[in-house]
Curated annotation (Swiss-Prot):
Keywords: ATP-binding, Cell shape, Cell wall biogenesis/degradation, Cytoplasm, Ligase, Magnesium, Manganese, Metal-binding, Nucleotide-binding, Peptidoglycan synthesis. It is an enzyme of class 6 (ligase). GO terms for cellular component: cytoplasm. ATP binds at residues 148-199. It comes from the Bacteria. Belongs to the D-alanine--D-alanine ligase family. Pfam families: Dala_Dala_lig_C (PF07478), Dala_Dala_lig_N (PF01820). Pathway: Cell wall biogenesis; peptidoglycan biosynthesis. This is D-alanine--D-alanine ligase. It comes from Rickettsia bellii (strain OSU 85-389). Mg(2+) 1 binds at E268, E282. HAMAP family: Dala_Dala_lig. Mg(2+) 2 binds at E282, N284. It is found in: Cytoplasm.
């Protein structure tokens, strides 16, 4: 399905990509989550960019022995290229804080908050960020009918890349009584907002710009659409009135800064049809770096090529005391 494959690395290994350079970077990716493939595709591009920029690079496939591997190679910096559980949820940053190894992307609090859709929603609302109405449903509630009026969105608590997200439309042959809760015993049920899908790239606290996603095949911006060529068109910059565009960037910066994010992030919004009201969907503290990813595309439009983007992210590396 995907044009970009991950034959360059075998599972659970340390692989020296470059043994000479100004600093030694451990590129941590792969791992055990449902987003393993995306992580490896991101890491391939990041690894090449780091080598081109003159760094010594060692790839580490995330596993239970990650601390042993890091102790063995003694990197100057960890480039956290993980997506999903253990990397994006704050686990790896927590370990690196203990080991006193500087790392890219957000720390424990921002990562864990952004990854948990329930807690991030509470954070957004506390900071007056507009979101769609939602409720939490547990498997034990034994709901037999639609929990809210259709159309609505089903979201797992802690998955990225739209894994497990389903949109239930009026005409769908769907019975909630048969929903099997594949990604945990609780889900968020969110009112579906019909509108324009907008994405904002943020780097070091400043919004670089925004683009709009135009769906070409699927009904919503799901995993397949995100990572398969020809399923979506990116309009960069997003064709919006200036006042709405500026508000979109300011809201994104507000989310990033109040959550104390670091490095690169991507904020997602819906601009509701008819009302032009912005609804925040989420902030991703570990945005993809694949050839189809949004942050590199927006950065490139604004004059930051991929190698420079990776170097800018690397400059933010630190650990938390």
């Amino acid at each position: 399905m995907h044009k970009y494959q991950t034959h360059w690395v075998e599972s659970s290994e340390i692989k020296i990509l470059s043994d000479k350079g100004k600093k030694h970077i451990a590129l941590v990716a792969g791992g055990m989550s449902a987003e393993r493939e995306v992580s490896l595709i991101s890491a391939e591009g990041v690894g090449k960019a780091l080598i081109e920029a003159g760094y010594k690079v060692t790839f580490i496939d995330m596993g239970a022995d990650i601390a042993v591997k890091l102790h063995e190679i003694k990197p100057d910096i960890v480039f956290n290229c993980l997506h999903g559980t253990y990397g994006e949820d704050g686990c790896l940053p927590g370990l690196l804080n203990i080991m006193r190894i500087p790392y890219t992307h957000s720390g424990v609090l921002a990562s864990s908050l952004a990854f948990d859709k329930v807690h991030s929603r509470s954070w957004f609302l506390t900071n007056n960020i507009n979101m769609a109405e939602s409720i939490v449903i547990s498997k034990g509630d034994n709901i037999k009918t639609d929990p809210i009026k259709r159309p609505y969105v089903i979201k797992p608590f802690t998955q990225g890349s739209s894994i497990g997200v389903e949109v239930i439309f009026e005409e769908d042959d769907f019975n909630f009584a048969n929903y099997d809760f594949p990604y945990g015993d609780e889900v968020i049920i969110e009112k579906y907002i019909k509108g324009r899908e907008l994405q904002v790239a943020i780097l070091n606290g400043k919004a670089l710009g925004a683009l709009e996603i135009k769906l070409l095949k699927n009904r919503f911006y799901d995993y397949e659409t995100k990572y398969t060529e020809g399923f979506a068109e990116h309009l960069c910059p997003a064709p919006l009135p200036t006042d709405i565009y500026d508000k979109l960037l300011k809201e994104s910066e507000k989310i990033y800064n109040t959550m104390n994010c670091k490095g690169a992030a991507r904020a997602e919004f819906i601009l509701e049809d008819g009302t032009n009201k912005l609804y925040a969907l989420e902030i991703n503290t570990h945005p993809g770096m694949t050839p189809l990813s949004i942050v590199p595309e927006i950065a490139a439009y604004h004059g930051i090529d991929f190698v420079n983007l990776i170097e800018e992210i690397l400059k933010t590396a630190s650990f938390e005391s």
